[in-house]
């Protein structure tokens, strides 16, 4: 067997879990939770009292961090574990916008990241396109969770006038 037959494609997460368990009773407003297999930010938590047949239960209302859709998880026993997504936010300098809607971003180590599309949020999309057209130095914040990535914010770091 030659070496070519044993080439493995390296993945950035190296098999790391996309979520971690957290007891439902400890998840608070503005924390994160997985509801219906989607990473969400918790906007409301209510807890019912312990009944004669069991546990206190938690009710979560949360917003999907990528689609902004409202999701609810109804009455999870507070002692049970819920999945919580690993959420990361990374800043990249915007280098280019392609005609097919992909952005070219400069990473910290000097490489380019070219696999991300422009955001679907209209106001953010307009700010990015207008700022880029004006030749401003723009830095975009990319939120990543559960294998998805999306541009979520924009900063002008002092432009070429």
Curated annotation (Swiss-Prot):
One Pfam family of this chain: eIF-5a
Record-linked InterPro entries: IF5A-like (IPR001884), IF5A-like_N (IPR048670), NA-bd_OB-fold (IPR012340), Rib_uL2_dom2 (IPR014722), Trans_elong_IF5A_hypusine_site (IPR019769), Transl_elong_IF5A_C (IPR020189), Translation_prot_SH3-like_sf (IPR008991)
Single GO term (MF): translation elongation factor activity
CDD domains tied to this protein: S1_eIF5A
One GO-annotated biological process of the protein: positive regulation of translational termination
Keywords: Hypusine, Initiation factor, Protein biosynthesis
Residues bearing the modification Hypusine: 52
Cysteine pairings via disulfide bonds: none
Residue ranges of the region described as Disordered: 1-21
Post-translational note: Lys-52 undergoes hypusination, a unique post-translational modification that consists in the addition of a butylamino group from spermidine to lysine side chain, leading to the formation of the unusual amino acid hypusine. eIF-5As are the only known proteins to undergo this modification, which is essential for their function.
SUPFAM superfamilies assigned to the protein according to its UniProt record, in alphabetical order: Nucleic acid-binding proteins (SSF50249), Translation proteins SH3-like domain (SSF50104)
SMART domains named among the record's database cross-references: eIF-5a
Amino acid composition bias (Basic and acidic residues), ranges on this chain: 1-12
Cited function: Translation factor that promotes translation elongation and termination, particularly upon ribosome stalling at specific amino acid sequence contexts. Binds between the exit (E) and peptidyl (P) site of the ribosome and promotes rescue of stalled ribosome: specifically required for efficient translation of polyproline-containing peptides as well as other motifs that stall the ribosome. Acts as a ribosome quality control (RQC) cofactor by joining the RQC complex to facilitate peptidyl transfer during CAT tailing step.
Family: Belongs to the eIF-5A family.
PANTHER family given in the database record: TRANSLATION INITIATION FACTOR 5A FAMILY MEMBER
The protein's name: Eukaryotic translation initiation factor 5A-1
Species: Medicago sativa
Upper lineage: Eukaryota, Viridiplantae, Streptophyta, Embryophyta, Tracheophyta
């Amino acid at each position: 067997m030659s070496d070519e037959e044993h080439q493995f494609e390296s993945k950035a997460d190296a098999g790391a879990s996309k979520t971690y368990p957290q007891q439902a009773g400890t998840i608070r407003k503005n924390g994160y939770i997985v509801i219906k297999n989607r990473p969400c930010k918790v906007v409301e938590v209510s807890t019912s009292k312990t009944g004669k047949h069991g546990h206190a239960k938690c009710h979560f209302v949360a917003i999907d961090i990528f689609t902004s859709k409202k999701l609810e998880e109804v009455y999870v026993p507070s002692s049970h574990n819920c999945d919580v997504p690993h959420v990361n936010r990374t800043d990249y300098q915007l280098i280019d916008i392609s005609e097919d809607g992909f952005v070219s971003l400069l990473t910290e180590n000097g490489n380019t990241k070219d696999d991300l599309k422009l955001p679907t949020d209209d106001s953010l999309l307009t700010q990015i396109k207008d700022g880029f057209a004006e030749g401003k130095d723009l830095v975009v914040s990319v939120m990543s969770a559960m294998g998805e990535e999306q541009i979520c914010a924009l900063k002008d770091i002092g432009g070429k006038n």
